[in-house]
């Protein structure tokens, strides 16, 4: 049977089970299940026998399959995911968390689910500052976040937190500039790193973008410690484990900030569950923005 061409915005391409499965996995379905439903959508197309179908009609067909197989909640998430393409402002996801909680992995997986190409790690910004600014001029950027206490006065009550806050403020200037440019250029973006202070950019972002914030943590200490054993190359586990108490202290500090700012805290007990939680945050936010725009 000839392939059905999906028509959208004046162009067309044959129906792709892979693309449909990616769309369905974006709403939280396991990939195997997403492919199964994509095949069922293909079966519906074959039954129709149409040579061409509008993208909106294909989406309605997919919603019918979802409603039958997964229920109304899945249909709602699918509609929110589709609304991403119709946003009048860029999506900016801010993912905070201390060392070893899985921020980079989660950000990469989230970008794939959302079809985004720009992921910025705040530690890269710190490394750039470190390369251009001498230790004498700005010592705090020459330390890892959990060692930044060495750059502040010994008289301070909690040097670990004070040093981290100072470093986050310095790096935060670069983070703000990157997010500001993304808003101006309407470029979707994920920013991940410990220097994303929960709630710090809420006033600056305002209505310029569709912002989603989350703090990623690992509540179980043994599981958190085990994460460092998975690291290799230039980031040996021993260095992190020697400073594990400081890393946990910064996690507690960030958690307090997140709760005070109303930023969701996501426990990365397993990466799949954490990804699903963050995806729900994104889709819920997009759904609220789409509803307010429509009304």
Cite the ranges covered by each PLM segment.
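Extreme N-terminal, non-catalytic leader segments
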Residues: 25, 30-92
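NTP-dependent small-molecule kinase module
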Residues: 252-295
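Glycine-rich phosphate-binding P-loop
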Residues: 93-114
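Short glycine-/polar-rich loops that comprise or flank the Walker A/P-loop
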Residues: 116-117, 207-212, 261-263
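Short beta-strand-centered segment that lines the nucleotide-binding/catalytic pocket of NTP-utilizing
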Residues: 116-132
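A glycine- and Lys/Arg-enriched "phosphate-lid" helix/loop adjacent to the NTP-binding pocket
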Residues: 210-253
């Amino acid at each position: 049977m000839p392939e059905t061409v999906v028509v959208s915005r004046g162009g067309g391409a044959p129906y792709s089970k892979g693309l449909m499965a990616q769309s369905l996995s974006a709403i939280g379905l396991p990939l195997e299940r997403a492919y199964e439903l994509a095949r069922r959508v293909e079966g519906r197309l074959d039954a129709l026998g149409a040579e061409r179908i509008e993208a909106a009609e294909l989406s309605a067909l997919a919603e019918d399959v979802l409603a039958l197989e997964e229920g109304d909640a899945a249909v709602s998430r699918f509609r929110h995911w589709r609304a991403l393409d119709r946003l009048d402002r860029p999506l900016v996801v801010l993912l905070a968390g201390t060392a070893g909680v899985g921020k980079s992995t989660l950000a990469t997986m989230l970008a794939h689910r959302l079809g985004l190409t720009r992921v910025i790690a705040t530690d890269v910004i710190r490394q750039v500052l470190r390369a251009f600014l001498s230790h004498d001029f700005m010592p705090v950027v020459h330390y890892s976040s959990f060692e930044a206490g060495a750059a502040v006065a010994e008289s301070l009550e909690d040097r670990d937190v004070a040093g981290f806050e100072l470093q986050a403020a310095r790096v935060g200037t670069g983070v703000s500039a990157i997010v500001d440019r993304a808003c101006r250029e309407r470029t979707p973006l994920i920013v991940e790193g410990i220097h994303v202070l929960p709630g710090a950019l809420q006033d600056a972002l305002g209505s310029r973008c569709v912002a989603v914030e989350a703090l990623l943590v690992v509540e179980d200490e043994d599981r958190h410690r085990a994460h460092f054993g998975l690291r290799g190359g230039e980031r040996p586990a021993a260095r992190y484990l020697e400073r594990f108490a400081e890393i946990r202290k910064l996690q507690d500090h960030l958690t307090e900030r997140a709760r005070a700012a109303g930023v969701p805290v996501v426990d990365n007990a397993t990466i799949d569950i954490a990804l699903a939680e963050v995806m729900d945050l994104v889709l819920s936010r997009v759904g609220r923005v789409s509803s307010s725009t429509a009304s």
